[in-house]
């Protein structure tokens, strides 16, 4: 019998399991170059405590004290109760019906939305939406005290709601138990989806040059001299118990012309139609919310330069491109809860000039994820994913309050993961599942202080891979840019300026730079 053949199988096993091979020599852990495929799945609008506050071993609701959870009013005095959930807790047409009146006199503390003895609103029900905007998020965080979420919300006490979940209720919870859950992961920027998608791909904040002389002039925010606090309107209710706040102007732009709340892509598919008689591939540039094409360096540029293959798979992208050309309704920002509800501002690369319609760059890298992720799943099953893939589920599968529920998106992402686990590429794959931002929901952990853009509130993140530590809760400090850091590390890319600036700001404020996710993996440093 051939001794080389006898020895081959144990060596192969040892390489995979870090055990001993023939001759007793120890096989070391693989290094980061063993990872050939990186997949990022980007869901929507949930704080860590909202979904994973009960997760065993995590820094969750069991660590919340009355002092750390108590909400104060706009003037800093303790609220006697939480405000009512303005306009009701559940979305119109949703069962159960939880009206505004039914939410009166909620205790000033976190509460379970799905409590059978309370509102009994399960994860299959769509709640109303909540403010999740740049300045409001900072005002709610209140310097790290997290005590003004109710004060500066448009949704009243709903900000303090969470779900009492477990592996039987939430498919991703079960997956988190099998792999790694990061419980110290913060959204990259303050506020909402638009800005956090930009930070996912470029660690940068978009600009609108000469905005004061543009159609967007009316969207320049009115901000106090601290650069953080919106100017409150004279007719704003003095107390959060009397109604939502009103501002002089909570706009989409900063006074120095950065775009920080939802602006529309300059290219179709966009929330703004083409100009009458204009190029159907473009959004109307005269619309106040059309952002000029951006030219900052993004992760796609760095990957291209390094000859690393990559793609952004937008759920329902193909349907949205077609709808923009034909005028088909109920695809882009769908009008009902069953529509695909494609969200143009969730497609960050569609804002960049080097990915304009008609370019080879766009054709190669901005791909249709298909309805229900069908095209993305085809690429998974065939083993043809590029080295770096981003997947954005369509609107009704992304877990965003106001237009979808938790359960639909969570099950969809779990289904996608099951395909990834069976993919020919799985053995050398790392999957990161996270959320763009907190959706306005409270979380008890203070974000580390850094730069003017973030990081914002804590959000869930799962690291799923054959290399991931199993049954592990990772307490390393991360934010959305940690995904870029990981990609940068793995493919030896230059560091984006926003990442370097974020690290410098963290250090200058007495914190550590953000981790790059490798602490969640069984690989050599």
Listing of model-derived features with the role each one plays in the protein:
Residues 18-21:
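C-terminal motif of bacterial Sec signal peptides marking the signal peptidase cleavage site
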Residues 24-525:
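N-terminal pro-sequences and low-complexity stem/linker regions of secreted or lumenal proteins
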Residues 1-9:
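Bacterial N-terminal signal peptides that target proteins for export
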